[in-house]
Design a protein with these regions (language model features):
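Substrate/cofactor-recognition hotspot
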Residues: 111-122
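Short alpha-helix boundary/capping elements
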Residues: 78-84, 116-117
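Acidic, glycine/proline-rich low-complexity segments that act as flexible tails and inter-domain linkers
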Residues: 19-69, 82, 93, 97, ...
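Short, structured motif recognition centered on aromatic/hydrophobic residues
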Residues: 70-79, 88, 108-109
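Positively charged n-region of N-terminal signal peptides that target proteins for export
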Residues: 1-4
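Bacterial N-terminal signal peptides
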Residues: 7-15
Length: 196
């Protein structure tokens, strides 16, 4: 899961395209932008509307390499990182309809706060709150603020800590502490986004 989010962060340029089709059960669910209808796009840029249908809806979102669930996670992560609340509202709903849990949406927002910026995460919180309320998602469906963390791989953590200390410790001891305490010893050990 975290690898998917990391891949999303590296693929931000792809998030400009916001059309999609996705197979859900037996029926095809049409995914369209939350803020613009195809007719509105065509009124300004017929070519952009065509590229959206042909390259994005009929190709990218139809590929088997990612499930609807994983593709939705990547899209939500990119929209959070780029602070695109208009499209985020639509794609959080798509993610929930594609099997992403409210707990996972919550953890994606939390995780990206550290990498995409706190203001972007706060914007995402505002969007997700409205969607959660509309869908009846309660606090019980969300991860605890301080859950039991996943087991720490001590050997890998020591190697990571030693590398960070060697490379940045002499010039930025605060970065060494900050990457260890809230990130690798807490955030990355939270169970709601575990791989698998």
């Amino acid at each position: 899961m975290k690898n998917v989010i990391a891949a999303a962060a590296l693929s931000l340029v792809l998030s400009d395209f916001t059309y999609a089709h996705e197979q859900r059960d037996e029926a095809m669910m049409k995914i369209t932008p939350s803020t613009l209808a195809d007719a509105d796009i065509q009124a300004v840029s017929p070519a952009l509307a065509r590229f959206g249908r042909e390259a994005i809806s009929n190709d990218l979102w139809q590929r088997d390499a990612l499930s609807a669930r994983d593709r939705s996670i990547v899209t939500v992560a990119m929209l959070i990182a780029r602070n695109q609340p208009g499209e985020l509202k639509h794609y959080i709903a798509v993610a929930l309809d594609s099997g992403v849990t409210p707990a996972e949406v919550s953890e994606i927002i939390t995780h990206l706060a550290f990498y995409a910026g706190w203001p972007n995460a706060m914007s995402a919180v505002s969007v997700a709150k409205a969607i959660f309320e509309a869908r009846g998602v309660t606090a019980e469906a969300l991860p605890a603020a301080s859950p039991t963390l996943l087991p720490l791989n001590e050997q890998v953590e020591k190697q990571r800590a030693d590398t960070v200390e060697k490379n940045v410790g002499p010039i930025s001891p605060g970065l060494v502490k900050f990457t260890a305490d809230p990130l690798f010893l807490d955030l990355w050990q939270r169970p709601a986004l575990k791989i698998g």
